[in-house]
């Protein structure tokens, strides 16, 4: 059975006051790296990190080492993502994986190797992270969100990143998990439930842009998913208790193709550097005025 999690986990630690919430967003997750660098340079460090999908990757690195140097390390990780084999390879290779699996296009092995290479030696379990950390995945068997707050770190992150159709479901214990964005894409409510009073939301820019009516067949599902993910975030924001302060950090605007289809491109890593720089400048300016 997968290790369970609720808001009472790690009760021996003091309640967090400052949380970093890192949302999902595929290749657009590079924006979060610029935001992290701006936060850490401003002397803002988290007592709690929660993440979804690509935000689970960025969040794990900063929870392992909440320093400017870690943000710079993340920038290096993003610079190498296009060459890492995570979402690369020939069409023939993808078709071979799809033919064998009948469910997905890519192996999760390159992503596992990348995570293991960028996490500190000896940090194998979530409990070993210096900063309390949780990431979310969607349980197939229970059709519900599942929060990982202890157990093998890389397995939890892989579960949170298992994009349907691209990567295989990840088995942890007796359950199988898919991408956390299916259940909770920007988990502000989780951070608040765990006690955070100041929340910094690191998002990839989607919620800054209005949705448009789909005009092509493949845009229909994308728009439907965006409505679902934004509705959950809007509900969390509407339900904030008194005394909780939330900072929605700016992404600096879109880089590359705009529109719903452009936002959901998962292999567009070539623009990572520009996305990091824009988000860094925008967030640094926001923090200076806050």
PLM region spans:
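Patatin-like phospholipase
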Residues: 1-52, 60-290
């Amino acid at each position: 059975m997968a290790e369970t999690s609720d808001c009472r986990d790690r009760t021996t630690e003091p309640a967090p006051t400052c949380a970093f919430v890192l949302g999902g967003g595929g290749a657009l997750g590079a924006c979060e790296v610029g935001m992290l660098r701006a936060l850490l340079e401003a002397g803002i460090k988290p007592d709690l990190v929660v993440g979804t999908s690509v935000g689970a990757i960025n969040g794990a690195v900063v929870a392992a080492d909440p320093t400017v140097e870690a943000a710079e390390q993340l920038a290096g990780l993003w610079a190498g993502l296009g060459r890492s084999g995570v979402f690369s390879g020939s069409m023939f290779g993808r078709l071979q994986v799809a033919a064998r699996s009948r469910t997905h296009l890519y192996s999760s092995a390159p992503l596992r190797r990348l995570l293991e290479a960028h996490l500190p030696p000896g940090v194998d379990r979530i409990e070993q992270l210096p900063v309390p950390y949780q990431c979310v995945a969607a349980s197939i068997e229970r059709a519900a969100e599942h929060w990982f707050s202890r157990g093998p770190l890389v397995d939890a992150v892989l579960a949170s990143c298992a994009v349907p159709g691209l990567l295989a479901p990840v088995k942890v214990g007796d359950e199988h998990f898919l991408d956390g964005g299916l259940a909770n894409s920007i988990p502000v409510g989780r951070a608040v439930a765990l006690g955070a009073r100041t929340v910094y939301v690191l998002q990839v820019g989607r919620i800054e842009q209005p949705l448009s009516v789909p005009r092509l067949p493949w845009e229909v599902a994308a728009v439907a998913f965006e409505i679902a993910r934004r509705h959950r975030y809007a509900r969390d924001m509407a339900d904030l208790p008194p005394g909780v302060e939330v900072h929605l950090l700016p992404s600096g605007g879109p880089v590359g193709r705009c529109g719903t289809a452009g936002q959901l491109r998962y292999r567009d890593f070539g623009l990572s550097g520009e996305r990091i720089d824009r988000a860094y400048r925008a967030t640094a300016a926001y923090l200076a005025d806050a």
